[in-house]
Amino acid sequence: MATTSTTTKLSVLCCSFISSPLVDSPPSLAFFSPIPRFLTVRIATSFRSSSRFPATKIRKSSLAAVMFPENSVLSDVCAFGVTSIVAFSCLGFWGEIGKRGIFDQKLIRKLVHINIGLVFMLCWPLFSSGIQGALFASLVPGLNIVRMLLLGLGVYHDEGTIKSMSRHGDRRELLKGPLYYVLSITSACIYYWKSSPIAIAVICNLCAGDGMADIVGRRFGTEKLPYNKNKSFAGSIGMATAGFLASVAYMYYFASFGYIEDSGGMILRFLVISIASALVESLPISTDIDDNLTISLTSALAGFLLF
């Protein structure tokens, strides 16, 4: 009887110890820290839209790039700093290339056109997924808008930047195409953000598509379009191909973080949007207005209709 009583008491003590919380346990760290409500909602939404990702995988991958999950404001401030350094380093690099005359000015301008927007979008996972993250991220191209205005108006002078972003080295050109380019990227960032494939379509067709259209068209564009002698079949095909491939690449990139769902249907929609953007870019009206505007608006409208 004594043995049975002792065993019973030990069992009760063990159960009590196991079920009771450890008061002195250290606070949780890293990605298991409390996160803002809007981050949790966004992650849950991403999970429900995709059956390919287990819940734990999406939660960890969605937060993997966020620097301080327990403090979204601090995390977004740091992300803004890192992205600004990356973006302006790219601009500085191409500006120096333009100043030294290493490449043809037209080629440098298009390389900047391709590079800046795509590099900026690579940094989006560093920001939180709500409107706060979108606003902090949009400050990066927003600062560039101010920079374009100051350069274009002649408030200050930067020969390298002007050469790398203008057709003929005239500072006033920055108030047209380059300014529309940055405005389009900023608008896509704020309005659509990283959970929308429309943002991918707009930026990829604007940057990769339009940039490659000019490069390919100048090199292989001997066969001109019948309705626009300033455009070529090679340039239009190059634009549609580059915009489409970049869109698919970023689809898989954002899907790896759980922001969107990669699928064959989405790939097909990206193809349609890239073809539509290339067709509009080839029209004479795109030259009269500005292809940075027409491509962005076409991609956004087609994306709105398809997604």
UniProtKB/Swiss-Prot annotation:
Induction: Down-regulated by abscisic acid.
Record's bilayer topology term: Multi-pass membrane protein
InterPro entries (alphabetical): Phytol/farnesol_kinase
Location, primary (coarse class): plastid
Reaction(s) the record says it catalyses: (2E,6E)-farnesol + CTP = (2E,6E)-farnesyl phosphate + CDP + H(+); (2E,6E)-farnesol + ATP = (2E,6E)-farnesyl phosphate + ADP + H(+); (2E)-geraniol + ATP = (2E)-geranyl phosphate + ADP + H(+); (2E,6E,10E)-geranylgeraniol + ATP = (2E,6E,10E)-geranylgeranyl phosphate + ADP + H(+)
Family note: Belongs to the polyprenol kinase family.
GO cellular component: a single term: chloroplast membrane
Observed effect of gene inactivation: Increased sensitivity to abscisic acid.
Name of this chain's protein: Farnesol kinase, chloroplastic
Subcellular location: Plastid, Chloroplast membrane
Transit pept. (range): 1-65
